[in-house]
Amino acid sequence: MEDDAVDFIREGKEVIGVKTAAGDSIEGDRIVLAGGIATIKLARKLGLRMPMQGGKGYSFTLPKPRKSLRLCSLLKEGRVAVTPMGDSLRVAGTMEICGSDTSVSPKRLEGVVENFCRFYPDFTKADFEGIEPWVGLRPCSPDGLPYLGHVPGQGRVIAATGHVMMGLSLAPATGWLVEKLVSGEASPIGLSQLD
């Protein structure tokens, strides 16, 4: 199902499911809050304060680059990540703390392209012409650590958000930990610093 959860279904004080924007009700034994920056709004409905800011990032996906790259690269000095994805190439970068503002900054886009081309001189700005940029918000917690674990006072609700720039990298480990918590197992690692 692809729809936003907008509220919780309760039996007394216990959360037993979610209501979606389309008006559907979905019940479950466990509810996982894993909506990135959008988790803030939903968590408030539980009386939970989950401080996060949106960290705006940009990317371009070149559908069939004229030069094929085979390895992922993190260009630290240029603040750009390069990810080959099948026949396409994703070039991403920047981190702009912005709340929920998803407006596009031409200066930031230009910086991503210029830095990429500086490290990969076989590419030029012309390779990016006509490519629509993507903009998204990373969920940034104040200390950079994700919110991961049972929500206090809500035994059936588990949080898994706030991974900043490491969401995709930490997804396998986060999924593994959430699976342990959902199945009722004790966490194999201490999560108290992540609460």
Residue positions per predicted region:
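Active-site substrate-recognition segment that forms the wall
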Residues: 7-10, 14-15, 25-155
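A conserved beta-strand/loop element that lines the FAD pocket in flavoprotein oxidoreductases
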Residues: 1-6
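C-terminal lid/capping helical subdomain adjacent to the catalytic/cofactor pocket in oxidative enzymes
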Residues: 10-12, 145-195
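Glycine-centered tight beta-turn/hairpin loop motif at sheet-sheet or coil-to-beta transitions
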Residues: 21-23
